A protein has these predicted regions:
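Interfacial loop-to-transmembrane junctions
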Residues: 36, 256-274
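Membrane-interface amphipathic/juxtamembrane segments adjacent to transmembrane helices
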Residues: 40-48, 142
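Cytoplasmic-side transmembrane-helix entry/capping segments in multi-pass membrane proteins
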Residues: 45-46, 83-88, 266-271
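Hydrophobic transmembrane alpha-helices
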Residues: 45-47, 53-63
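Membrane-interfacial helix-loop connectors
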Residues: 58-113, 188-259
Length: 288
């Protein structure tokens, strides 16, 4: 019972910390929907296919709420699959402050961010330019040259207050995130971090494949765990990169919540793991 309450308390604390940004993000979305929908459509029509570049740069902001916003925009066909992929790849959320707290790792942090931006841009370009003509429409989704409706939720209320509308959508997502955080926290409380670290240490060259899988867990705490394992020497730089590349914070959870196409969600999840694992294994050959 104590294990249950500890996991629930941790989930509540993590979720409450995220609430202010999520609310501000949804408040911004509501405002954009009601006042700048047409201008956003015109801007996207003029160069929406290159959105993966700003997506890669903005994804480096150390918080996981931005990936949630990107998921909403993708589900609303406002941004391309390459853009949301770039945001997911570039997202590192809580790992950045943790690594920045170690002066000896500042060079590593700069290298990590540079590599993530580079892989995010390349991955977004591949998905949006050459692969767009190969992938079936049912898997691709997202922006198609026009924005039918700039809407980041399932429902939109023109007559309601934007503050109340943003609060309602924030609370809806908060409940979904809280459930994920509680389940993951319960697993960590039950098994502990040491067995996880031991399993990672014995993986060798295939370690990035496992850390990328761990990184898919839609919880900001996972990036902290990966950063701590790297600081403690339990995983390599390539494995850290793989986990943080596959880790999109709560972005994946929100994507599965708001995007109705399970095929697109599964494709994006699998692609994110593949990019993280492949990039991490590539970086394994470097003395980092």
């Amino acid at each position: 019972m104590e294990l249950f309450f500890d996991a629930l308390l941790d989930a509540l604390i993590d979720g409450v910390k995220m609430l202010p940004f999520l609310y501000l993000a949804y408040l911004l979305i509501e405002w954009l929907e009601r006042h700048h929908g047409e201008s956003i459509e015109e801007a996207l029509a003029g160069g929406g296919r290159w959105g993966f570049i700003p997506g890669a740069l903005l994804g480096c902001v150390p918080q996981c709420g931005f990936s949630a916003v990107a998921s909403n925009l993708y589900a609303s066909r406002v941004i391309t699959p390459g853009t949301v992929l770039a945001v997911f790849i570039a997202t590192s959320d809580e790992a950045i402050p943790l690594l920045a707290a170690e002066p000896s790792l500042w060079v590593t942090l700069v290298l990590l961010l540079a590599c993530k931006v580079a892989f995010a841009i390349v991955g977004g370009w591949l998905l949006d330019i050459p692969l767009r003509h190969i992938l079936p429409h049912s898997l691709y989704g997202g922006y198609e040259g026009h924005a039918d409706e700039v809407d980041c939720h399932e429902e939109h209320e023109e007559t309601s207050s934007i503050f109340l509308a943003a609060l309602r959508h924030t609370l809806e997502i908060f409940v979904f995130i809280l459930l994920f955080s509680f389940i993951i926290g319960l697993v960590f409380e039950a098994f502990g971090e040491e067995p996880i670290a031991a399993a990672l240490s014995g993986m060798g060259v295939f370690q990035p494949m496992l850390t990328a899988l761990v990184g898919l867990v839609p919880n900001c705490a996972v990036s902290v765990l990966l950063a701590q394992l790297y600081v403690q020497g339990a995983i390599t730089f390539g494995s850290l990169f793989a986990g943080l590349t596959a880790g999109a914070g709560v972005g994946l959870a929100v994507l599965w919540r708001v995007n109705p196409s399970w095929k697109q969600n599964l494709f994006m999840t699998g692609l994110l793991w593949a990019v993280g694992a492949a990039a991490g294994m590539l970086l394994q050959i470097l003395p980092l």
